[in-house]
Amino acid sequence: VHPWDLKALDKLIVMSAAYRQSARVDSQQDPENRLVARGPRFRLSAETLRDQMLFLSGLLVEQQGGPSVRPYMPEGVWDETSRYGDLRGYKADMGSGLYRRSLYTIWKRTAAPPNMTLFDAPNREVCTVKRSRTNTPLQALSLLNETTAVEASRKLAERILRDGGTTDRQRLAWGFRLVTARLPAETELQLLETGLQQDLQSFTAAPEEAQKLLTVGATPAAKDLPAQQLAAWTLTANVPVDSSG
């Protein structure tokens, strides 16, 4: 049907009914999935997870081709393995280089991007036929604190506040569906609503903490939204992003 058109073949596969099965587990219907009654349940790969965060936030730069880029990385990440030249003193790009697809991230095998290796990206020292897939507390902490995750959550929060509706529940449901491609259950909505109110109270009592959170990342925070409100929604927007990873 699609001779040598791999992109068309991939699209055909991912849009098929078999590929788009629900991953919800049913204790009564094929609980062990021996009959393939549901889709597999696993987190996104390292590159896809980062790209999804950038896309949802509106930060993703979809330019194709060009040289490698240098997104955010911990300070001094290259210094321990290089003592001279361009491979010492890692410095992140400014502007669009921070938001290109992970495919274009510069890769140093002796000091690979920590946020990639943390989510089981191959180290590129040898060929990898099949990636390992782990779920660790450190991965969740990374999605809560890493610069790209926090900045993307803030921009996603701005998007939710502007486009998600007029009430908190409307916005929470809209943002949840945007990230997970499904509507939240009532219990999930209640948990998000409770967390939002707690965060809002905390930032109202400590506005300096709200300002500190909004300075994470190179993209400035929206000036037309109250700082405490935006900070609270930043943490709330991070929840479905974290859970989807």
Where are each of the predicted segments found?
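C-terminal structured "cap/appendage" subdomains that terminate the fold
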Residues: 164-234
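Amphipathic alpha-helical segments within well-ordered protein domains
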Residues: 1, 141, 157, 173-180
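An acidic, gly/pro-interrupted, aromatic-rich
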Residues: 7, 20-171, 219-245
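Loop/turn elements at helix/coil->beta-strand transitions in domains of secreted/extracellular proteins
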Residues: 2-11
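Residues at helix-coil transition
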Residues: 14-15, 145, 180, 197, ...
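Short, solvent-exposed turn/loop segments enriched in Gly/Ser/Thr/Pro and often Arg
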Residues: 12-16, 25-26
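Short, basic alpha-helical nucleic acid-contact segments in DNA-binding proteins
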Residues: 1-3, 19-20, 199
